[in-house]
């Protein structure tokens, strides 16, 4: 094989030189290679003439001879020059002989072709003696690379129990050698570990070799794949690991963890409440576990049911009806666990462990008494005196068979109409009237009794419905109140009123009422219409109002009950004055007909009078308050506190907390005596101990004011009960365009003591206070 490679290399170089000679003509440089033959004839132009060839990774000493360029220019001053990216770095040329040399070992996998340009230039002038010629140096491949996998580890999965030949994964390895050279880049694969389960073809496809790959036996396989080229070259990096995971399928039956399950439950367990749990083992993965539990045999399928917990795959046994220890103390039956989604074609065999026996022991508990019926319905005719209505019966279901005591809940018999005996007999204590209550709903309690007759244990209740039957004990009466009227000049046969009757008793399907007048000697007659109504008409005509303004007619009404009852209802017929058209013009019963009596009219009049008096008082009070506000000062006249003056003078007597003398002393530096009336009145604010007054010559006025303010501030801070001095003050401000400008004391500076405020006395009584505050003090003038 190596000889063939060398021969192919020499042949390629020879053909390249021939092509160069053919294209260059007589004056173009010629490229020569080792073993080049003399050319006596022009070669065809389709030969590749501009190529040189060299083997990669040559073991000979550097530099390596690549080829030779020649020219028919025979000049002593000619030299050969190479140009290109790799000229002078990797390749060089002998300037005199034209030999092209490689100064580095070449690697075809890095660079497979080098592009160079050959020139013949003058040694002295470096001018081209011929046109430049480009040529290519191709690196011949040698089999110096082994195949390398794209990944060191491949991950794949395949369903368990797959058929033989099922594709798993395709692995890929790449050989960097020249694929055009036979055998250099051809990749071959083989499994060196795990080949008893899987196979691989020359394309790198791995497939199953056997069909019984069971995930429950081995869930994952580690396969080692090795690759080499066609010439058998392999290396360390030509090995890869393939991790093949078996995907689970539902091919296993659930198996009970026990062959027998025993549970003990109280007999009073609630229907539908879990009484036990069944556990199975299913080697399949959770998504393939769908266990279904069922009772195989026995007559208890209607007593118990088994549900599946989807999260834990457990069976939950629940009772479907109440358990009774006194009837059955133990239940035994067989159960089966199946999987409806199992893949039977992959199922090897059934182990028989998917069946088990269940035993349920019922425990006795103290149960409440049990009534023989769910409810009782008794009937009793009304007006009966303490008869036996009915009997309720309850028994102790336990083995103790204790005696039972009965009682009626007071909340169901608030009127205490009934009583019950120890034997459960129910009697009525009072006569029952169906027209008052037609039904009675009683709640009867049953308790177990100990040997002393005291209730013990649990209790049970039952509803007793007592229906009161009707008896014909109510005579018929008018269906509504009638107030008939008749004209005093009514003619004979004039209809006065049509009456009908009603009965409080249960009315039969076809009730029949009979009507009759008790006294036939009146001026009225009764005509029975035979439809449970009757007409009252004038018998003779002409009534005398002066003799009788009202006529009272007793009417007898009889029913068709057994026995028949007759009632008497009285009609009061008023005689009225009428006009010619027969319209009533005056009736004494009009006031009564309106439904308003004399007492009611008096009460209404008193209410109206009371409301009127209250309204007048409210209006008067608002008027007085409005007048009081009209005489009071507005909010703009408030200074330090609200002072209300009901008269022109004397208002300053209320300002005990506002010491006017202090302000005057500041202005004049003298002490103004307090009025005796101010000392007699109690102070509104906390009394402040003032500092001793200093003469104006010893201390300035404004300084004394500052001291006074500090003292008041300190005492106000220490007095938790007194009102604060730093409250909001509202001052009236007349404006800069007025004569007095601002009246606020805050706008007064310390140098206003020379201002004459006597003009305030001319402003009237409302400014008297300001005139006294800012007016000159005679004592100050004396001191000055």
From Swiss-Prot:
GO terms for biological process: adherens junction organization; bicellular tight junction assembly; blood vessel maturation; cell migration involved in sprouting angiogenesis; cell-cell adhesion; cell-cell adhesion mediated by cadherin; endothelial cell morphogenesis; homophilic cell adhesion via plasma membrane adhesion molecules. Glycans are attached at residues 59, 155, 441, 523, 535. Residues 46-599 are extracellular. GO terms for cellular component: adherens junction; bicellular tight junction; cell junction; cell periphery; cell-cell junction; cytoplasm; external side of plasma membrane; nuclear membrane. GO terms for molecular function: beta-catenin binding; BMP receptor binding; calcium ion binding; cell-cell adhesion mediator activity; fibrinogen binding; protein phosphatase binding; protein tyrosine kinase binding; signaling receptor complex adaptor activity. It is a single-pass type I membrane protein. Residues 621-660 are annotated as: Required for interaction with PALS1. Its main location: other. Ca(2+) 3 binds at residues 143, 145, 175, 177, 184, 229. The chain crosses the membrane at residues 600-620. SUPFAM superfamilies: Cadherin-like. Pfam families: CADH_Y-type_LIR, Cadherin. Residues 25-45 form a propeptide. The keyword Signal applies. Keywords: Calcium, Cell adhesion, Cell junction, Cell membrane, Cleavage on pair of basic residues, Cytoplasm, Glycoprotein, Membrane, Metal-binding, Phosphoprotein, Repeat, Signal, Transmembrane, Transmembrane helix. InterPro entries: Cadherin, Cadherin-like_dom, Cadherin-like_sf, Cadherin_CS, Cadherin_Y-type_LIR, Catenin-bd_sf. Ca(2+) 1 binds at residues 56-57, 107, 109, 144. The keyword 4Fe-4S does not apply. Expressed in postnatal endothelial cells of the retinal vascular plexus (at protein level). Residues 1-24 form the signal peptide. Three calcium ions are usually bound at the interface of each cadherin domain and rigidify the connections, imparting a strong curvature to the full-length ectodomain. This is Cadherin-5. It comes from Mus musculus.
